[in-house]
Swiss-Prot record:
Class of this enzyme: ligase
Principal location listed in the UniProt entry: cytoplasm
Subcellular localization, as worded in the UniProt entry: Cytoplasm
Organism of derivation: Borreliella burgdorferi (strain ATCC 35210 / DSM 4680 / CIP 102532 / B31)
The protein's name: Phenylalanine--tRNA ligase beta subunit
One term under GO cellular component: phenylalanine-tRNA ligase complex
This protein's UniProt keywords: Aminoacyl-tRNA synthetase, ATP-binding, Cytoplasm, Ligase, Magnesium, Metal-binding, Nucleotide-binding, Protein biosynthesis
Reaction it catalyzes: tRNA(Phe) + L-phenylalanine + ATP = L-phenylalanyl-tRNA(Phe) + AMP + diphosphate + H(+)
All copies of domain B5, residue ranges: 287-362
Lineage: Bacteria, Pseudomonadati, Spirochaetota, Spirochaetia, Spirochaetales
Transmembrane segments annotated in the record for this chain: none
Residue positions binding Mg(2+): 340, 346, 349-350
Length: 566
């Protein structure tokens, strides 16, 4: 969970009132944040958040904004946001190469002017950038932010798909390296190059003088890409693979810079062919959030309350959320810096927090029951202990993913996969039917760790099944992966034999026709005439799709079927 260290004097100055440490702790409670101490020598407060839904709070500016709104009724407003059909005047352009649509497609930016950066401000900006990129940005994979002295940049800026051999001086060095060399030698390249290394070309940001601004999301240019104390004019950009996440990160940054005292000047992004978007250009910061409908009866039913519409609107306003009624329906308008309202339940949560938890009377549960582990869970725990005992490390993955990872890279068809009809992003478009793609994706970013690699997961998978009422079936699977120069079919066969020996289950093996195995090096596992899974060596074609350059063998079985025949 995100942790902040903020200067107490800056924090209180921004709130406009003085508070003791105990009072600050109480101010933080509604926002799922905890006061974690005060260092008198540095003058810093330590704060830890208990969830990641509100990245707008991960700076003293965002926290102060929310506290002033909640406790003192000061609703912020920002007049520099463009909206659909109402673009603001822009002061620079970013031209996006069409080839970036398949690499890291989105980039948006703004200019910030009129304030001289001092030591504490610079430290605050760097911490904000780090928290946003590491947590909300999923260690720069989802989004990454860059900040520059705009006086050294000539607009328009070009965001291009560059040759890996393009050279520039990266931040922290005094000599040129190619993009490929940065991936292999620079500390930031070693840490983050896995995000883009599987592409033939890499992202590059150039100004109109053909000077390198940065190599996102890896490293800035040493000549342009460093902020210093005394700088006054800044260019801020965010790149990413998720349209809304990239826009939101930029919006949060713009609001924070404005609250710090900067003037915000919009910048236009122009997308060139073959981008398949509903728009060709966007002036940012841009308000993209959708209104969410809510129902008074639903709110009172879930909260066990009897709130009026007026009271609900006041509670929402304390959270910075405006609301209105039209045609006998009620809607909320998310703030510029928030996009965490995915469902009416999220609105209800804000009403609850705005109302204050202490205003709800505690009630004892009306039903009581004693739980126990299900037979499936007991069996799974036994299997888990065996895997750990054989030297495997357990992984935990998301059940949803992209067509690219689950289907295309695996060289299989999608006939058994469940597709989400209205996905928020194509990265979470399918529900997994196998754990193996998750294991391979982990392996693809683990080449810097000593071999052999031995990882496993016990988790849910879902498949189409037209014989059921729902049209789907959900199972618990066990899957593991072994990788290394010496890993072969014989190695994994030995592990499989050991596993089933300790489970006291007899199995039969038949040659597998699975397309992602090397021909002749895969086996299906059969018990009492039923196929429950298989194992084998992954084909070089599939390994290459994932950017893996060392032999891998995988295993996967259906634990439900396995347990029923044990």
């Amino acid at each position: 969970m995100p942790k902040l260290e903020i200067y107490k004097n800056l924090f209180l100055d921004k709130i406009g009132k003085n508070f003791t440490n105990l009072e600050i702790s109480e101010l933080l409670e509604p926002f799922k944040a905890e006061f974690d101490g005060f260092d008198e020598s540095s003058g810093k407060i330590k704060i830890e958040f208990n969830d990641t839904n509100r990245p707008d709070l991960w700076s003293y500016l965002g926290l102060a904004r929310q506290i002033k709104t909640y406790f003192f009724g000061e609703m912020p407003y920002y007049d520099f946001f463009s909206k659909k059909g109402d673009f603001k005047k822009f002061y620079g352009e970013i031209l996006v190469d069409g080839k970036m649509s398949q690499i890291r497609p989105f980039i948006f930016g703004f200019l910030a002017k009129g304030l001289i950066i001092n030591d504490k401000m610079l430290e605050t900006l760097i911490q904000f950038q780090e928290k946003l990129c590491q947590n909300y940005g999923q260690k720069r994979r989802r989004i990454a932010m860059g900040m520059y002295n705009s006086n050294f940049i000539k607009f328009p800026i070009s965001y291009i798909a560059s040759s890996p051999n393009h050279k520039f001086v990266p931040f922290g060095m005094d000599y040129e390296l190619s993009l490929l060399e940065i991936n292999e030698k620079h500390p930031k390249g070693l840490e983050y190059s896995h995000i883009i290394k599987n592409f033939d070309k890499f992202p590059l940001l150039l100004d109109d003088n053909n000077n390198v601004v940065s190599y996102p999301p890896i490293i800035n240019s040493n000549n342009i890409g460093s902020l210093k104390v005394g700088d006054t004019d800044l260019f801020v950009e965010v790149t990413g693979i998720d349209f809304e996440a990239t826009l939101l990160a930029l919006s949060i940054a713009a609001c924070d810079f404005y609250d710090m005292g900067f003037e915000i000047l919009p910048v236009k992004t122009v997308f060139r062919e073959p981008f398949n978007l509903d728009f060709k250009e966007l002036v940012c910061p841009y308000y993209f959030q959708e209104e969410v409908e809510f129902n008074v009866e639903n709110i009172n039913r879930l909260l066990g309350s009897n709130l009026t519409l007026e009271r609900i609107c006041l509670s929402l306003k304390k959270m910075g959320v405006n609301s209105y009624s039209k045609d006998f329906k009620n809607y909320i308008v998310p703030p510029f810096y928030r996009n965490d309202f995915l469902h009416e339940v999220d609105v209800i949560e804000d009403v609850m927090i705005g109302e204050g938890l202490s205003s709800f009377n505690p009630e004892l549960p009306k039903a009581f029951a004693v739980g126990r582990l299900s037979p499936l869970e007991e069996f799974s725990r036994n299997v888990r202990n065996l895997m750990v005992g054989m030297g495997f490390q357990e992984m935990i993955y998301n059940y949803m993913g992209s067509k690219k990872d689950f289907i295309d890279r695996m060289n299989i068809n999608d006939q058994n996969f469940l597709k989400v009809s209205n996905p928020m992003t194509e990265n979470y478009e399918y529900i997994r039917a196998s754990i193996i793609p998750n294991l391979l994706k982990s392996e693809s970013v683990s080449s810097n760790f000593p071999y052999p690699h031995k990882i496993f997961e016990i988790g849910k998978v879902a498949l189409k099944n037209l014989d059921t009422t729902e049209g789907t079936s959900t199972f618990t699977n066990l899957a593991f992966l072994m990788s290394g120069k010496e890993i072969s079919f014989n190695e994994i066969n030995s592990i499989v034999a050991t596993l089933f020996y300790y489970l006291n289950i007899e199995i039969n093996l038949i040659e597998s026709k699975t397309t992602f195995y090397i021909n002749g090096r895969g086996a299906d596992i059969v018990i009492e005439g039923f196929n429950i899974g298989g194992f084998g060596e992954i084909s070089p074609y599939v390994l290459n799709n994932f950017g893996i350059f060392i032999p891998c063998s995988v295993f996967e079985v259906n634990i439900n079927k396995l347990m029923s025949r044990s």
